[in-house]
């Protein structure tokens, strides 16, 4: 029998975790969030420097790559064996190198929290001009002044408490815990040459300074940590990991649920009474 929910969220990434928290806040709403990756238990996720040690076969990333980049060096991608027959009938084997320009890594999170669980934890909002430009194109509600309240609602900023920042939100924002001497020298020199900016997420982004980070008590504060973990005890929220969605079920031009494959290769269906939300990866 299909399991039935009011909302099914496909993808427990940055947006999916927020949706799961907000929707399940209503105890009368049944919410299911599905993630293709594993749970975010790997300590390399939570220790800030850990993301640098995942390597090329990252178990919590989709491990995407770019097309070959002409600016990169050439590398051998294959060495197919071939045989030739000489005029005397002798058979000779040889390998022929096939080379192409190296591809660039494009890691994207495949775990609870999505890319917020494997990124560099830099907290930098978009530029005011971009939001105002979107609004000028007819997207009502997207100007900087209109969305600022949502930035403030989402964060708990340990550094600033002013008209640009919020307190008491789920996403913890803190200063870098270790400002090493070479970086201090760089910031000092850049500030003298141009100008210093203590807060890239304040009145303006231009200038030189230290980043703010999505960390709490020296650990990563992913959207899974900020939004999903506080909601896990809600009886109306179901989290399914290692669930590869195979098909969105459509009935009369309406998404009514999903078909997915679990970690053992078994197929299951889930029905959504109200809404099926698909979170696709954003790659620019």
Model-derived segments and spans:
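N-terminal redox-cofactor-binding region of secreted/periplasmic oxidoreductases
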Residues: 1-282
């Amino acid at each position: 029998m299909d399991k039935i929910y009011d909302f099914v969220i496909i993808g427990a990434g940055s947006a999916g975790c927020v949706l799961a928290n907000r929707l399940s806040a209503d105890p009368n709403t049944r919410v299911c969030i599905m993630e293709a990756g594993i749970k975010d238990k790997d300590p390399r996720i939570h220790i800030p420097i850990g993301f640098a040690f995942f390597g090329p076969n990252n178990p919590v990333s989709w491990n995407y790559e770019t097309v070959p980049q002409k600016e990169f060096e050439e590398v051998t991608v294959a060495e197919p064996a071939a045989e030739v027959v000489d005029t005397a009938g002798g058979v000779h084997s040889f390998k022929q190198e096939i080379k192409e320009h190296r591809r660039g890594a494009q890691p994207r999170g495949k775990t609870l929290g999505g890319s917020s669980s494997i990124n560099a934890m830099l907290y930098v909002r978009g530029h005011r001009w971009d939001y105002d430009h979107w609004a000028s194109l007819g997207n009502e509600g997207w100007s900087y002044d209109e969305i600022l309240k949502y930035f403030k609602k989402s964060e708990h900023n340990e550094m600033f408490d002013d008209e640009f920042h919020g307190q008491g939100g789920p996403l913890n924002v803190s200063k870098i815990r270790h400002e090493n001497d070479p970086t201090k020298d760089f910031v000092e020199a850049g500030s003298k040459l141009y100008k210093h900016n203590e807060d890239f997420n304040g009145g303006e982004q231009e200038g030189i300074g230290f980043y703010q980070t999505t960390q709490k008590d020296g650990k990563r504060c992913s959207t899974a940590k900020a939004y999903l973990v506080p909601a896990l005890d809600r009886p109306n929220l179901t989290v399914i990991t290692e669930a590869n969605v195979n098909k969105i079920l459509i009935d009369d031009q309406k998404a009514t649920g999903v078909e997915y494959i679990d970690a053992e290769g078994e197929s299951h269906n889930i029905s959504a009474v109200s809404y099926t939300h698909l979170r696709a990866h954003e790659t620019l």
